A protein has these predicted regions:
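Catalytic-core regions of glycoside hydrolase
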Residues: 1-258
């Protein structure tokens, strides 16, 4: 909300862009907007206070929060408020409108990224060095004149400009991260990027050089730091069970082979 209010949105206009609370993960992975909203003013205030309290509690336990990173996401009505910005339409996702995206190689991207991070700092303080951003999560429209290499370079550069110790958290999901995205992170990749291998148990990617439509230069995401993850109850599979024998084998094997 604070971010959008820097660009001629009223409080209510910015607030009403938010999806309902159950859908925030998908909104901030650039999949949808508005759906399930609007939320009340009271809810926004309560959510902010609760988040700040959670941050303090987690810090006391030595737990790092993964904050939101910025890869150019904007509302689909952004041109009504900022007509001079070059906007990339991102199409739809599951019958819903995806948020638009500004060009990361455009003249205004660095300014927008800095504004976003300052707005987030106002909300939560300087609480973490970990940031999540996933350009083209489950779709989106890649313009022919803007490569994943350029996007990765610009997103990481703007993040490190704000926080020199930042670590960009990227989900390994479907065909992401692409080879070009990883290569675009350049020399910073070793110290400032971490890949979450979300389906580490069911369908690991860390030991592959090919997944979906992606062909990598080397396994372990071209030698990038990564985290073995277990994502089981999604996609209509809500049962409380797990593959215990597979877990007992796969986790030690990952330690040995990585």
């Amino acid at each position: 909300i604070n971010f959008l209010m820097n660009y001629n949105y009223s409080f209510d206009e910015a607030k009403d862009w938010l999806a309902g609370p159950s859908y925030y993960a998908w909104q901030f992975m650039d999949n949808l907007e508005i759906f399930g909203g609007p939320v009340s003013d009271r809810w926004v205030k309560g959510r902010l206070e609760m988040a700040r309290e959670n941050q303090r509690w987690k810090r006391s336990l030595g737990i790092d929060t993964v904050l939101q990173g910025y890869a150019g996401m904007i509302p689909t009505d952004f041109a009504n408020h900022q007509p001079d910005v070059e906007i990339l339409k991102q199409g739809g996702w599951c019958g819903l409108n995806r948020p638009d995206m500004i060009r990361t190689d455009g003249a205004l991207y660095d300014e927008y990224a800095a504004t976003f991070y300052k707005a987030q700092e106002w909300a939560f303080g300087e609480t973490s060095n970990y940031y999540a951003a996933d350009p083209f999560h489950e779709g989106g429209i890649r313009p022919s004149d803007l490569s994943d290499t350029t996007i990765a370079s610009e997103v990481l550069d703007s993040l490190l400009e704000y926080d020199e110790d930042a670590v960009w958290m990227v989900q390994a999901w479907w065909s992401n991260p692409t080879n070009d995205l990883l290569n675009g992170m350049g020399e910073y990749r070793q110290d400032h990027v971490m890949i979450l291998d979300l389906t580490g148990l069911e369908a690991p990617k860390w030991d592959k050089t090919s997944y979906g439509s992606t062909e990598l230069d080397a396994p372990e995401f071209n030698g990038t730091d990564w985290v073995w993850c277990m994502l089981e109850n999604y996609g209509g599979n809500p049962s409380m069970d797990g593959q215990l024998a597979k877990m007992a084998n796969d986790i030690p094997n990952a330690y040995k082979q990585a």
